């Protein structure tokens, strides 16, 4: 969540409001979401959505519905066309497929940014430091989708400085017997 907020801030988003998915919201009809949340709570003047955007209970809300309500209640709705990569629509499924393949160049093209993972440095056994090759170990959040196990050229950022490195995603090679998947950067 923090990583997503940071990325949106870097993209120029000034204010980010998150709508918690409560039972009330989950079962709210699209019309009620527009009236209660968009108009009532947020008093929107402009809404931008993708052409395949759906919202409301049973995904019955559509961009056309937003436009219709916008005319009635005085807000503008802009429907953005899908971005394409050749003949294929760029979607979260497409992005996940490329990440799962380890196609980091395609991932970067589709997302407009490099893959990144954030976390707290975990102290290991100090074996890398002992052999004059210190490493940084991160345990990625469980919900973080990671590329396949392998070795990647990376850049690490720490205290306003950047460091080039090589990162192993997978079982930690410097420590025998580890069963968890980690991120170890040299």
Language-model-derived ranges and their functions:
Residues 124-186:
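Phosphate/ribose-recognition catalytic cores of enzymes acting on nucleotide-derived substrates
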Residues 6-7, 36-38, 144:
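Short, flexible, glycine/charge-rich loop motifs used to bind or transfer phosphoryl groups or to couple energy/partner
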Residues 1-15:
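Active-site rim/loop-helix segments in enzyme catalytic domains that contact anionic ligands
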Residues 20, 51, 169-171:
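Short secondary-structure boundary segments
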Residues 24-134, 149, 157:
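Classical nucleotidyltransferase
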């Amino acid at each position: 969540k923090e990583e997503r907020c940071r990325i949106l801030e870097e993209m120029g988003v000034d204010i980010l409001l998150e709508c918690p998915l409560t039972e009330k919201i989950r079962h709210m009809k699209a019309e009620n979401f527009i009236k209660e949340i968009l108009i009532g709570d947020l008093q929107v003047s402009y809404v931008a959505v993708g052409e395949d955007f759906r919202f409301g209970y049973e995904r019955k809300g559509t961009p056309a519905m937003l436009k219709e309500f916008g005319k009635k209640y005085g807000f503008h709705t802009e429907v953005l066309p899908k971005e394409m990569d050749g003949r294929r629509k760029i979607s979260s499924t497409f992005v996940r497929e490329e990440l799962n393949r380890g196609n980091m160049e395609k991932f970067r093209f589709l997302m407009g940014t490099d893959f990144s993972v954030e976390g707290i440095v975990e102290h290991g056994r100090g074996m890398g430091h002992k052999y004059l090759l210190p490493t940084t170990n991160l345990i990625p959040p469980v919900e973080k989708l990671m590329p396949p196990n392998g070795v990647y050229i990376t850049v690490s950022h720490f205290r306003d400085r950047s460091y080039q490195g090589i990162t192993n995603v997978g079982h930690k090679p410097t420590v025998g017997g580890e069963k968890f998947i980690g991120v170890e950067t040299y």
